[in-house]
Amino acid sequence: MRLGAQFLPEKFDEYIASVRMAEQAGYEFAWLVDSQVLWEDVYVYLTHGLDSTERITFGTAVTNPLTRHATVTASFFATLAGLHPGRVALGIGRGDSSVRTMGLPPARTGQLEQYVRSLRPLLSAQTAKLDGADVRLRWLQQDPGVPIMMSGTGPRNLRLAGALADRVMLYVGVTPEAVQWAMRHVGEGARSAGRDPAELKVSILCAMHVSDDHEGAAAACRWAPAACANHIADLARNNPRHDMPEVMVRLLKAREAYDYYTGHLDSSAAHTAYLTTELIDDFAIAGPI
């Protein structure tokens, strides 16, 4: 098992100290949130994080097709990978707080697919078709080797990730029931594209807090199910005939209003108060090990 840690681009000095600590502790990935309204610029933090460490891989978890044009994303990640070979990954999703805070909906599956299909050639020193135009990064002479990770909660995006991504990030909780359900859809997508599902790299996004105090540890992880519930609600709204597992349905039924501005990814936010320890345990690793 390989471990990664997620970081918010804020409190710069604390961030640098934290990524160094993560590297020393053996973490292999440092994933940064891309949400330009709520936090500082992720590109700046990725760059300084890489400059301040020696081994750990840095990437977005996740960027999106709506606030970052494909050429901008490709140029940045190709540049960064040229400076730090083998230590850069590009995480992409449909967009959550980065777009909802501007009153916009997340990207549709078709938009996400087109974005990734455009990024592949751009990141490989090849020509991409963008809005009918042939576009390439003129300065890029060879493939810098930037793996693409795609996140997913619902079947469509999970299947898309299985078809296109180098790594899939599951955002469905940590129960065997939910993970197996998600992997079934990832596998379907992989096979539809002629890929072997067994060769895909898979990550699970969850909160983790190790402590002898189970209740206290769970309370520290409230942010994870509270945020995931927004994606589950979208899935239920866009696909009423969904087949999501019962653990996700339970969270959906308990879900209350969510305020991105006052406490996104914050376990102390008022909108996490409804979460019981049982619900949290479905979406986090909390307590003694």
Short names for language-model regions:
Residues 19-24, 46-57, 77-88, 162-163, ...:
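Acidic (Asp/Glu)-rich catalytic clusters
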Residues 1-60, 146:
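N-terminal beta1-alpha1-beta2 module of alpha/beta enzyme domains
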Residues 1-13, 63-70, 142-153, 208-211, ...:
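Active-site mouth loops of central-metabolism enzymes
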Residues 105-139, 179, 184-289:
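An alpha-helical appendage that flanks or caps ligand/catalytic pockets
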Residues 38-47, 174-190:
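Active-site-adjacent beta->alpha loops and helix N-cap segments on the catalytic face
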Residues 3-7, 30-32, 57-61, 88-92, ...:
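Hydrophobic faces of well-ordered beta-strands that scaffold small-molecule active sites
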Residues 11-22, 73-76, 152-160, 289:
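Short, acidic/polar
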Residues 26, 49, 80, 119, ...:
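Conserved, mostly hydrophobic/aromatic
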